[in-house]
Design a protein with these regions (language model features):
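Intrinsically disordered, low-complexity regulatory segments enriched in Ser/Thr/Pro
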Residues: 41-82, 125-130
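Amphipathic alpha-helical segments
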Residues: 2-21
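Surface-exposed, interaction-prone regions used to assemble/regulate multi-protein complexes
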Residues: 65-81, 85, 89, 93-105
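Ser/Thr-rich, low-complexity intrinsically disordered terminal regions
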Residues: 27-37
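Short secondary-structure junctions
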Residues: 16-28, 101
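Acidic, proline/glycine-rich low-complexity IDRs
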Residues: 3-4, 16, 89-130
Length: 130
């Protein structure tokens, strides 16, 4: 799918479903965009980008790094519904503290399903909520 059309469709989806991201949208020269939303706790942000005609969603950790992310491929217009459903799942799981940011005992940040966190000895978790 062409980059500008892809980004337009994802922005329309975000406007309808997650308008809190809209004020941070930054359009790029290649037709892609990125945006973010700071957590209620203030410790981290969710970020979304549409580089290379795919959705990338991730977490920016408290140090400003955005290495924690995943890619959602959406090559054809027919894939759009499943792609936006997957994007929603990530956003909702992060906001509901089902997918959490944590810092391991070595100081490295990562994300994990909250149900698995109890096995992370010496780690600290960060909640979306205050």
């Amino acid at each position: 799918m062409e980059q500008k059309l892809f980004s337009k469709l994802i922005i329309e989806f975000i406007e309808r479903n997650y308008p809190e991201f809209i004020k941070t949208i930054k359009h790029q020269d290649d037709g892609s965009f990125d945006c973010d939303l700071k957590s209620d706790s203030g410790f981290f942000s969710i970020w979304i980008a549409t580089y290379n005609s795919e959705i990338t969603i991730g977490i920016e950790d408290p140090t400003g790094q955005n290495n924690i992310h995943t890619h959602i491929s959406c090559y054809e217009i027919e894939d759009l519904k499943s792609c936006t459903t997957e994007l929603s799942k990530y956003i909702e799981n992060i906001k509901a503290d089902k997918l959490i940011l944590y810092k391991d005992k070595d100081g490295k940040y990562d994300w994990i399903e909250s149900s698995e966190f109890k096995n992370q000895d010496g780690s600290k978790k960060f909640s979306w909520k205050k």
